Regions:
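Dynamic helix-loop-helix/coil hinge segments at AAA+ ATPase domain boundaries and subdomain interfaces
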Residues: 5-27
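Walker A/P-loop nucleotide-binding motif
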Residues: 41-57
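Post-Walker A helix-loop "phosphate-sensing" segment adjacent to the P-loop in P-loop NTPases
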Residues: 62-73
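Conserved P-loop NTPase "ATPase switch" module shared by AAA+ and STAND
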Residues: 81-102, 106, 113-123
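Conserved AAA+ ATPase "SRH/arginine-finger" region at the nucleotide-binding site
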Residues: 142-154
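C-terminal helical "lid" of AAA+/P-loop NTPase domains
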Residues: 176-180, 187-201
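Conserved C-terminal helix/linker of AAA+ ATPases
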Residues: 200-218
Length: 228
């Protein structure tokens, strides 16, 4: 497909279960999503770094459960009854809930009615800065599973998928070149893909090792400027 045409298309990542890249760092999380509705207490906390795949797994679960996605900033005591009526709720940024009593009510109401709750956060519930004692005890008791940072194999696979989502093709030697040089994290992989996409579009050239070197240099410059 012509690159000019690709630039005019919206970027829509593949979010199906079959599109999720399973590896040692995330296989427990995948197993728990697949295990639904057999969740103890009807709730699960899924935590991991930005870009680790929490949102992808949540979308898989939402499609299966018919659940609703709520951001923690929108969770209020008055909104709880309406939210709980969905029967299955994904709470994004659950570690940043402003009204702790609202989350406590949501947990209790969903459990009472046989509903389900999937909490997404960067840290495990036991590490949240929770002030309400009753909520803290519920969170500590909640089944939780984390996604660790990727190994080299998954890091390369993640970059390939993100590039494919953007309709970009890249030789495997370029991926190997980058995996050996970028930080081993989902965030670094995502930033690299965005940088490569921008450079390839601006220079109207294929993704090569030369372009990858330029992307690495740009990322290093941004990092150095941020640190200074």
């Amino acid at each position: 497909m012509d690159r000019q045409l690709v630039l005019d298309l919206p970027h829509r990542p593949a979010q199906g279960r079959e599109d999720f890249l399973v590896a040692a760092c995330n296989e427990d999380a995948v197993s728990w999503i697949d295990r639904w509705p057999d969740w103890q207490g009807g709730s699960l906390a899924l935590y991991g770094a930005t870009g680790s795949g929490k949102s992808h797994l949540a979308e898989v679960w939402r499609a299966r459960s018919g659940g609703v996605l709520i951001d923690a900033s929108d969770l209020t005591v008055s909104a709880v009854p309406e939210i709980a009526r969905a029967g299955a709720v994904i709470l994004n940024h659950a570690d940043a809930v402003g009204e702790e009593v609202a989350l406590l009510h949501l947990i209790n109401l969903l459990r009472q009615d046989g509903g389900f709750l999937l909490c997404l956060s960067d840290e495990a519930p036991g590490r949240w800065n929770t002030q309400l004692a009753d909520l803290r005890s519920r969170l500590v008791a909640m089944q939780s599973v984390g996604i660790a940072e990727p190994d080299d194999h998954l890091l390369g696979a993640v970059m390939l998928k993100l590039l494919s989502d953007r309709q970009l093709r890249v030789p495997l030697e370029v991926i190997s070149f980058l995996v050996a040089r970028i930080e081993r994290s989902f965030a670094a992989a995502r930033t690299m893909v965005v940088t490569l996409d921008r450079l390839a579009a601006g220079e109207m050239r294929p993704l090569t090792i030369a372009l990858a070197r330029k992307a690495l240099a740009q990322m290093a410059e941004i990092s150095n400027n941020s640190a200074s």
